[in-house]
Amino acid sequence: MMQTILSNGIAMVLIILIINIVYVSFFTIRMILTLKGQRYLAAGISTIEILVYVTGLSLVLDNLDQIQNVIAYALGYGLGVIVGMKIEEKLALGYIMVNVITKELDLDLPKQLREKGYGVTNWVAGGLEGDRTALQILTPRRYELQLYDTIKTLDSKAFIIAYEPKTIHGGFWVKAVKKRRIKE
């Protein structure tokens, strides 16, 4: 039965395409997990990843005389990158640090964000046009877009910069941010 499927040109192209999408999706997720320090989960995924990779590559190498298989392999690779990144966006692993500078001095904004469940550190900062409120907010990535919308609703002219912190240590941040539930 398998030999019949593999001898069908269209079926072979689809199998190679799907195998490479799966392989590269696993590869992308494994790399992201590795960068985020999830080494054991990354190692487990790499085991599945390599099995899929060897299967797909052997199908292509056994049929190198058929250019459509090579094209399917390359196309599957590109699509796998997109699929892997979409999966990672949905998983939203890790945390983000959001720095906000208000257009004007606004001591109420930090309070409003805290009431919504965000951990906020704030201070008065001097800008070219006068005093402003500067805020640092650490939140899980899954709340990133919600946080941006909240900030824009409370201060539509706020300056926002976000980045992923490499290391988080000390303070109430580590325990409190993990337990905190953001209110909508």
Swiss-Prot record:
Keyword Flavoprotein recorded: no
Protein name: UPF0316 protein YebE
Domain of life assignment: Bacteria
InterPro entries on file: DUF2179, DUF5698, UPF0316
NCBIfam families listed in its UniProt record: PRK04164.1-5
Subcellular location: Cell membrane
Coiled coil, from the record: none
Keyword Repeat: no
Regions crossing the membrane: 9-29, 41-61, 67-87
Keywords, ordered alphabetically: Cell membrane, Membrane, Transmembrane, Transmembrane helix
Membrane topology term: Multi-pass membrane protein
Recorded GO CC terms: plasma membrane
Family named by the database record: Belongs to the UPF0316 family.
